[in-house]
């Protein structure tokens, strides 16, 4: 159909038949190059091809008729191609815009997407992370945590009892404890005065306490004065007791000291069932390494009294009896037998100077 009275195909290159032939010829030339079998070249062109490419005065190759036709038809083809590309690009841009619109819809805020839905609950609203737009009535999930957040700390919680005050270290004393300590410090001088006034009875009780374990350690049956003991042994004990510091009639506290106070437990022990049995230390001599049968023969020897001071504070006397012959026999045996003579090293007395 013509436009503005022009013929349908004014130009032979615009005809569809010639157009297809020209395109086929250009494609074959582009692939195979000029050859002798081509129907578009004459014998003269074949001769010139064999001789070499002939150049014009400008240095460029002269154009052939087929190439001129191709150049005439090429602008139209380019226009048609551009139009087709434009139409295709227009068609393609619409889906791209639609795709971009879909992508933009994906990046919408969560709350806006939730509002666009038909009343469906937003699953991300209950997620542990928070969105950028948090509603005002949102519940703080950290308020139920075991730790206390800084913003929700109440002033009443800051006044809690200090847990370190109950610990054994760095204990803080309250006012009541401080007053109690002051009261106890005031009572100390009063107790000191009372202790000074009662020094005599306290010392007497201390002597009794010291004498009691001594009495338990050494039974009174062994130290009781028996009928076999001479009278001068008891007199020596009384004389030694009279010369002791305890013999003063008045103590430091002003109380009189009873001389027979330490002898009262002895008198009580005299009335025991073992008071009638005499004590013979010679019976224990057989367990000694210096035992000899001569000790049994000298059992009739006269015993003497021996004294032992238990402590410096009470000056109590404990009497015992040992035989004189046993002591003499022991000393003579020890003097005659030298224990160092049997030692592996020689003694100094045994060495003779050359």
From Swiss-Prot:
The modification Phosphoserine is found at residues 115, 174, 292. This is Uncharacterized protein FLJ45252 homolog. Residues 182-199 have a biased composition (Polar residues). Residues 32-41 have a biased composition (Low complexity). The modification N6-acetyllysine is found at residue 19. Keywords: Acetylation, Phosphoprotein. The lineage of its organism: Eukaryota, Metazoa, Chordata, Craniata, Vertebrata. The keyword Acetylation applies. It comes from Mus musculus (Mouse). Residues 45-54 have a biased composition (Acidic residues). The modification Phosphotyrosine is found at residue 291. Residues 1-74, 87-115, 182-208, 235-298 are annotated as: Disordered. Pfam families: BMP2K_C. InterPro entries: AP2_assoc_SerThr_kinase, BMP2K_C.
């Amino acid at each position: 159909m013509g436009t503005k009275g022009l013929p349908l195909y004014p130009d032979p290159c615009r005809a569809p038949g010639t157009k297809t032939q020209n395109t086929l010829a250009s494609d074959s030339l582009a692939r195979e190059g000029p050859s002798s079998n081509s129907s578009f070249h004459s014998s003269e062109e074949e001769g010139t091809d064999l001789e070499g490419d002939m150049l014009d005065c400008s240095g460029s190759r002269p154009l052939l008729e087929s190439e001129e036709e191709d150049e005439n038809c090429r602008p139209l083809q380019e226009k048609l191609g551009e139009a087709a590309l434009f139409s295709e690009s227009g068609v393609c841009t619409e889906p791209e815009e639609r795709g971009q619109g879909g992508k933009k819809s994906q990046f919408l805020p969560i709350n806006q997407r939730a509002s666009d839905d038909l009343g469906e609950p937003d699953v991300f609203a209950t997620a542990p992370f928070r969105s950028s737009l948090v509603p005002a009535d949102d519940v703080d999930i950290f308020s139920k945590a075991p730790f206390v957040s800084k913003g929700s700390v109440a002033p009443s919680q800051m006044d809690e009892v200090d847990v370190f005050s109950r610990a054994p270290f760095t204990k803080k004393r309250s006012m009541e404890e401080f007053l109690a300590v002051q009261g106890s410090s005031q009572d100390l001088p009063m107790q000191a005065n009372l202790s000074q006034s009662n020094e005599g009875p306290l010392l007497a009780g201390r002597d009794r306490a010291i004498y009691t374990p001594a009495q338990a350690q050494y039974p009174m049956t062994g130290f009781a004065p028996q009928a076999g003991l001479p009278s001068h042994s008891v007199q020596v004990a009384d004389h030694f007791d009279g010369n002791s510091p305890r013999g003063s009639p008045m103590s430091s506290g002003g109380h009189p000291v009873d001389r027979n106070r330490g002898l009262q437990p002895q008198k009580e022990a005299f009335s025991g069932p073992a008071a009638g049995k005499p004590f013979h230390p010679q019976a224990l001599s057989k367990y000694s390494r210096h035992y000899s049968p001569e000790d049994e023969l000298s059992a009739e020897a006269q015993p003497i009294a021996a004294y032992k001071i238990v402590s410096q504070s009470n000056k109590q006397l404990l009497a015992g009896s040992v035989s004189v012959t046993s002591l003499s026999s022991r000393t003579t045996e020890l003097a005659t037998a030298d224990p160092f003579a049997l030692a592996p090293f020689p003694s100094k007395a045994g060495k003779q100077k050359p």
